[in-house]
Amino acid sequence: MKAFTQHTGLVAPLDRANVDTDQIIPKQFLKSIKRTGFGPNLFDEWRYLDVGQPGQDCSARPLNTGFVLNLPRYQGASVLLARENFGCGSSREHAPWALDEYGFRTVIAPSFADIFFNNSFKNGLLPIILPEAEVDELFRQCESTEGYRLTVDLAAQTVTRPDGKALSFEIDPFRKHCLLNGLDDIGLTLRDADAIRVFEEKHRQASPWLFGAIK
């Protein structure tokens, strides 16, 4: 998993509340369990005018030119600004996969659905909760300023605006540690691989009858 330490990026404002996971990545794209290939289909039903299908060449599809991610000023955005209850709906890790592959490193919102919130941390995407008044001000500044960028410092737990004002956010210490060090569940397990092997060998010697059928 990619570590997250500090990131400065262009902000795209998605001014919609209760964005659900089927809107983030529609159900027809969930047939694959690979973590790649979902970026072109992020917000598929909003980005395009047709109905997308798995494996389709998205470069030839008709665009919804009014959708925020299709506007020239937001091309290359890596910070998504959203409204309350972002990521509600069914559980699917494909949602953070799609956001990550598109290029987003972090999503800032007043609140998130719990399952999406947890899945994001496990896949290297940083969900940041800020008070609604602060999010409102970020929307105002972003929409009135072309090229609006924010700096997220995970170690300091701050989001810094272009005017220098730093906004503080809370994060669970363990999740912070994992993101700073790029540790997902597999990475955490592999970090203790030597200790696991030692335990298994001691267990085998203490209870050999449990391993008689194992070759």
UniProtKB/Swiss-Prot annotation:
Q: Which GO terms describe its molecular function?
A: 3-isopropylmalate dehydratase activity
List the record's Gene Ontology CC terms alphabetically: 3-isopropylmalate dehydratase complex
Record InterPro entries: 3-IsopropMal_deHydase_ssu, Aconitase/3IPM_dehydase_swvl, AconitaseA/IPMdHydase_ssu_swvl, IPMI_Swivel, LeuD
Q: What is its EC number?
A: 4.2.1.33
Q: Which Gene3D superfamilies match?
A: Aconitase, domain 4 (3.20.19.10)
Q: Which reaction does it catalyse?
A: (2R,3S)-3-isopropylmalate = (2S)-2-isopropylmalate
The record's CDD domains line, in alphabetical order, gives: IPMI_Swivel
UniProt similarity note: Belongs to the LeuD family. LeuD type 1 subfamily.
The protein's job, in short, is: Catalyzes the isomerization between 2-isopropylmalate and 3-isopropylmalate, via the formation of 2-isopropylmaleate.
Its recorded name reads: 3-isopropylmalate dehydratase small subunit
Organism (species)? Azotobacter vinelandii
Gene behind this chain? leuD
